Amino acid sequence: MAVIKCKPTSPGRRHVVKVVNTDLHKGKPFAGLLAKKSKSGGRNNTGRITVRHVGGGHKQHYRLIDFKRDKDGIPAKIERLEYDPNRTANIALVLYADGERRYILAAKGMQAGDKIQSGVEAEIKTGNAMPLRNIPVGSVVHAVEMKPGKGAQIARSAGAYVQVVARDGAYATLRLRSGEMRKVPVDCRATFGEVGNAEHMLRQLGKAGAKRWRGIRPTVRGVAMNPVDHPHGGGEGRTSGGRHPVTPWGVPTKGYKTRSNKRTDKYIVRRRNK
């Protein structure tokens, strides 16, 4: 994997930094694991904007990823690594011994030809998945479930991982990258190793158009709007906003705590680092 800084042959190329991975498959994705992906433009079923800064972008297919890793006891081989436009991580096409193919997240160091397996009898090796009750304390894992059988929800983006720091009774304690310590049922599954493509954080798009290709629309500052559009809007000439920073709906921002899920508070041993 190489990080390439483009020559400044134009203003749009001057700040571009690319991450090039020559190991990725250059052809089309596996058709049997693709699904239609419709664009919403950030609108809900009534046509109103519910997510700002969304719209346009290149047409994409969704890749059906196996986040459950529940095909136990059947060895599999990594056929190839692929780019996935729907996530920061790369994905791997896996061929099981019974002929089935699935996509999984590509772990750090994973290559075509590697052998992987799921289940309690799998060895401790990058890419293998098993319940947390069978994973040694101190192990680094990714693609961790929060509810048994629901599918991975934690540590799925490029370079992400969590560490198993303790196991007591029905729960295992995980240390997340944010510093948060969280309890998860020991029957939840996780995959050994880190998510690959950690160099993704080094890339620079270099121009506004590259954001638009990805379906990301501009972000307008509140102080540049009219009073009807934002609490910071209006005024004669340039203003500072005149109040503490708030969202367009008047909720304080920049450090204001908004977490209100008391039902799951008991699973958080320590809040994330500030």
From Swiss-Prot:
SUPFAM superfamilies (alphabetical): Nucleic acid-binding proteins (SSF50249), Translation proteins SH3-like domain (SSF50104)
Any one biological process term the GO annotation gives: cytoplasmic translation
Alphabetized Pfam families for the sequence: Ribosomal_L2 (PF00181), Ribosomal_L2_C (PF03947)
Region ranges (Disordered): 223-274
tRNA processing is among the record's keywords: no
Keywords of the record: Ribonucleoprotein, Ribosomal protein, RNA-binding, rRNA-binding
GO cellular component: large ribosomal subunit
GO molecular function: rRNA binding; structural constituent of ribosome; transferase activity
Endpoints of the signal sequence: none
NCBIfam families tied to this protein: rplB_bact
Assembly description: Part of the 50S ribosomal subunit. Forms a bridge to the 30S subunit in the 70S ribosome.
Family affiliation: Belongs to the universal ribosomal protein uL2 family.
Reported function: One of the primary rRNA binding proteins. Required for association of the 30S and 50S subunits to form the 70S ribosome, for tRNA binding and peptide bond formation. It has been suggested to have peptidyltransferase activity; this is somewhat controversial. Makes several contacts with the 16S rRNA in the 70S ribosome.
Xref: HAMAP family: Ribosomal_uL2_B
The protein, known as: Large ribosomal subunit protein uL2
Taxon lineage: Bacteria, Pseudomonadati, Pseudomonadota, Gammaproteobacteria, Alteromonadales
